[in-house]
């Protein structure tokens, strides 16, 4: 039977002896567990600050005269038209990635249907030839 030293499976004999104990590390370890960390809570939903709740609501604006409404309506309409024109020009000037990708596969035809058709026609010719010999 081989000696325990020659066996690769066995651990070295030095590993069987326990390492020297470190006393300062144990003392530090005892101090750490005494303080427990609080469990983490799920994030709460955001709510307005308490100071905002106690603030009085803003008074409603005074009614505007008919003339002021007409003037501001024209300004709003002009601003809306400008925004629509800008959006339209942005859309027209954008690259159309989908149209380019859709046109790429169309020019390249797959050779598979052609190969299948040629193979079937050759098999049909061989079948006809065999039937005529009989």
UniProtKB/Swiss-Prot annotation:
Membrane topology: Single-pass membrane protein
NAD listed as a keyword: no
Effect of loss of the gene: The deletion mutant displays no growth defect or morphological abnormalities, and shows no difference in nucleoid position or spread. Loss of the gene has no detected influence on the virulence of M.tuberculosis. Absence of the gene disturbs polar localization of Wag31, resulting in disturbed nascent peptidoglycan synthesis. Deletion of the gene does not phenocopy the effect of agrimophol and does not compromise M.tuberculosis survival at the pH levels found in macrophage phagosomes.
Bilayer-crossing regions: 111-128
Domain of life: Bacteria
Region (Disordered), start-end ranges: 1-68
Basic and acidic residues: compositionally biased ranges: 1-10
Principal location listed in the UniProt entry: membrane
Alphabetical UniProt keywords: Cell inner membrane, Cell membrane, DNA-binding, Membrane, Transmembrane, Transmembrane helix
Biased composition regions of type Basic residues, renumbered to the chain: 23-48
Single GO MF descriptor: DNA binding
Localization per Swiss-Prot or TrEMBL: Cell inner membrane
GO CC field: plasma membrane
Activity regulation behaviour: Can interact directly in vitro with the compound agrimophol, a phloroglucinol from the A.pilosa plant, whose extracts have been used in traditional Chinese medicine to treat pulmonary infections. Interaction with agrimophol leads to disruption of Rv3852's DNA binding function.
Oligomeric and partner information: Homodimer in solution. Is probably able to self-associate in higher oligomers along the DNA molecules. Interacts with the N-terminal region of Wag31.
Primary role: Binds DNA in vitro. It has been proposed that Rv3852 plays a role in nucleoid organization and may function as an anchorage to tether the DNA to the membrane. However, it was later shown that it has no influence on nucleoid shape or compaction. It plays no role in virulence and only a minor role in the control of transcription, and does not appear to function as a typical nucleoid-associated protein. Interacts with Wag31, an important cell shape and cell wall integrity determinant, and facilitates the localization of Wag31 to the cell poles and the cell wall, thus enabling nascent peptidoglycan synthesis.
Other observations noted: Cannot complement an E.coli hns knockout mutant. Expression in M.smegmatis results in altered nucleoid morphology, defects in biofilm formation, sliding motility and change in apolar lipid profile.
Protein name: Histone-like protein Rv3852
Species per Swiss-Prot/TrEMBL record: Mycobacterium tuberculosis (strain ATCC 25618 / H37Rv)
Origin organism lineage: Bacteria, Bacillati, Actinomycetota, Actinomycetes, Mycobacteriales
Gene designation: hns
